[in-house]
C-alpha cells in the first residue's frame, strides 16, 4: 500500500500449550465453554470475580486471543463488534506512558488477576460469508497486493487493530473514556474533534460526523468509490485518505506512525503482562515490587 513504520515485532503461534503439551494446530486451543452462548465480550472481559482467569495462558509469556461468537447486546452493538481488547498498564516512574492506567506492580502473575486480560475476536467474521468467501479485502490474494475491494469486516485488519490496542495504541479519531455502571471502563467516540490518541503524527477526526456522511453516501451511491469512503476531514489541516491501523472502517488499515511505534516499543520494554524482554526487569521476581494476593487493577476495554 505505502510506507509504514517497522515496529520490529514478530508474533509467533505457540506450538506447545502452557503445560508443555504439543498443540495439534499451532496457536490454537479448543476449550469447552459451559456458560451462555454466544458470549457477551464486555461481560466476559469485564468480569472481576476471577472465574474466567483459568481460560488464560500466562500473559507474561503469551498474548491470549479468544475467538467466540459475540452475543447481541440488545441496546448495545456487541453482536456486530468485530473485536475488543484490554489496554496495557504502565508502571509508575520515568518510563510511564501517557494515557494508560498506572500500576506500581512490576511483576504481575496470572494468579493475581481477577479478570481475563486478553483480546477477543468475533468468530462470526472469521468464518466464510454468505458468498462462500472470507471476510477480508482482496489485497491478500492479489499478486501486487493492491486492493480493489475493502471489506469493513476484514478479520486480518481486526486482529492487527486489536493487537495495537493490546500494545498501547488508542483510536485515530476523537474519543473519550466512559466509566460504566458495572465498574468497567470503555471508550466511545466524542462529539467534538480532539486529538486523543497521544500521537501528534496521526491526524484526528470526528467519527460521529464521518458516520453521518457514510450513511448518506451509501444511500445515494449504488457503486461506492473507494476514495470517497476513505476520505477523512481532520480536526485541522487538509483532508486525507484513511490508512492507519487504529482507525475504523472504511480504512486501508495498514499504517503505523513513528509515534505509534514508540508507544508500542515502550509497552514492550516496560509494561507488565506483556511478553518479551524488558529493560526495567518487569515480569521477573527481581523486579523490586511484587504484590501478594489478588490485585485491584483497573482494566480498560476498548473496541
Segments (PLM) and residue ranges:
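A short, structural micro-pattern
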Residues: 5, 59, 113-115, 237-240
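Pan-zinc metallopeptidase signature
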Residues: 243, 247-303
Amino acid at each position: 500500500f505505502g510506507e509504514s513504520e517497522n515496529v520490529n515485532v514478530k508474533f509467533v503461534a505457540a506450538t506447545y500449550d502452557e503445560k508443555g503439551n504439543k498443540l495439534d494446530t499451532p496457536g490454537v486451543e479448543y476449550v469447552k465453554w459451559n456458560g451462555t452462548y454466544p458470549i457477551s465480550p464486555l461481560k466476559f472481559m469485564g468480569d472481576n470475580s476471577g472465574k474466567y482467569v483459568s481460560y488464560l495462558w500466562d500473559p507474561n509469556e503469551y498474548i491470549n486471543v479468544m475467538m467466540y461468537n459475540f452475543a447481541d447486546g440488545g441496546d448495545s452493538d456487541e453482536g456486530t463488534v468485530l473485536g475488543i481488547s484490554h489496554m496495557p498498564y504502565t508502571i509508575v516512574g520515568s518510563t510511564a506512558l501517557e494515557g494508560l492506567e498506572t500500576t506500581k506492580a512490576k511483576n504481575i502473575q496470572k494468579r493475581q488477576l481477577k479478570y481475563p486480560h486478553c483480546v477477543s475476536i468475533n468468530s462470526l467474521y472469521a468464518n466464510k460469508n454468505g458468498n462462500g468467501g472470507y471476510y477480508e479485502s482482496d489485497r491478500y490474494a492479489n499478486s501486487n497486493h493492491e486492493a480493489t475491494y475493502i471489506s469493513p469486516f476484514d478479520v486480518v485488519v481486526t486482529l492487527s487493530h486489536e493487537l495495537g490496542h493490546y500494545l498501547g495504541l488508542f483510536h485515530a479519531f476523537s474519543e473519550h473514556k466512559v466509566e460504566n455502571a458495572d465498574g468497567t471502563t470503555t471508550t466511545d467516540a466524542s462529539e467534538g474533534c480532539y486529538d486523543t490518541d497521544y500521537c501528534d503524527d496521526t491526524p484526528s477526526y470526528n467519527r460521529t460526523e464521518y458516520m453521518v456522511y457514510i450513511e448518506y453516501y451509501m444511500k445515494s451511491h449504488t457503486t461506492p468509490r473507494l476514495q470517497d469512503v476513505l476520505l477523512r476531514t481532520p480536526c485541522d489541516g487538509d483532508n486525507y485518505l484513511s490508512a492507519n491501523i487504529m482507525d475504523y472502517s472504511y480504512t486501508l488499515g495498514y499504517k503505523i506512525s513513528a509515534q505509534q511505534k514508540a508507544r508500542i516499543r515502550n509497552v514492550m520494554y516496560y509494561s507488565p503482562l506483556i511478553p518479551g524482554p524488558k529493560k526495567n526487569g518487569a515480569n521477573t521476581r527481581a523486579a523490586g515490587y511484587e504484590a501478594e494476593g489478588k490485585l485491584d487493577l483497573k482494566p480498560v476495554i476498548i473496541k
